[in-house]
């Protein structure tokens, strides 16, 4: 019989959905010479917040 191991679900990641606006902005990001700036015009569908439409 093989020994049992204990697995902890909280190690590595937490399950669930994070609000999008909490994850898309990184205020301390430093630009690099290889970064590319792109702009897109997005029109949200009715009922979708503009910041989540992109």
From Swiss-Prot:
Gene3D superfamilies: RuBisCO large subunit, N-terminal domain
TM segment ranges: none
Residues bearing PTM N6,N6,N6-trimethyllysine: 14
Record keywords: Acetylation, Calvin cycle, Carbon dioxide fixation, Chloroplast, Lyase, Methylation, Monooxygenase, Oxidoreductase, Photorespiration, Photosynthesis, Plastid
Xref: InterPro entries: RuBisCO (IPR033966), RuBisCO_lsu_fd_N (IPR017443), RuBisCO_lsu_N_sf (IPR036422)
One Pfam family named in its UniProt record: RuBisCO_large_N
GO CC, alphabetical: chloroplast
Propeptide: 1-2
GO terms under biological process: photorespiration; reductive pentose-phosphate cycle
Catalytic activity: 2 (2R)-3-phosphoglycerate + 2 H(+) = D-ribulose 1,5-bisphosphate + CO2 + H2O; D-ribulose 1,5-bisphosphate + O2 = 2-phosphoglycolate + (2R)-3-phosphoglycerate + 2 H(+)
Statement: the UniProt record of this protein carries the keyword Membrane: no
N-acetylproline: modified positions: 3
Assembly behavior: Heterohexadecamer of 8 large chains and 8 small chains.
Protein name: Ribulose bisphosphate carboxylase large chain
Gene: rbcL
């Amino acid at each position: 019989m093989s020994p049992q191991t204990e697995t902890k679900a909280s190690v590595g990641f937490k399950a669930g959905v994070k609000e999008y606006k909490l994850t898309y902005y990184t205020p301390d990001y430093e630009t690099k010479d290889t970064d590319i700036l792109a702009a897109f015009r997005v029109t949200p569908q009715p009922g979708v917040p503009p910041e989540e439409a992109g």
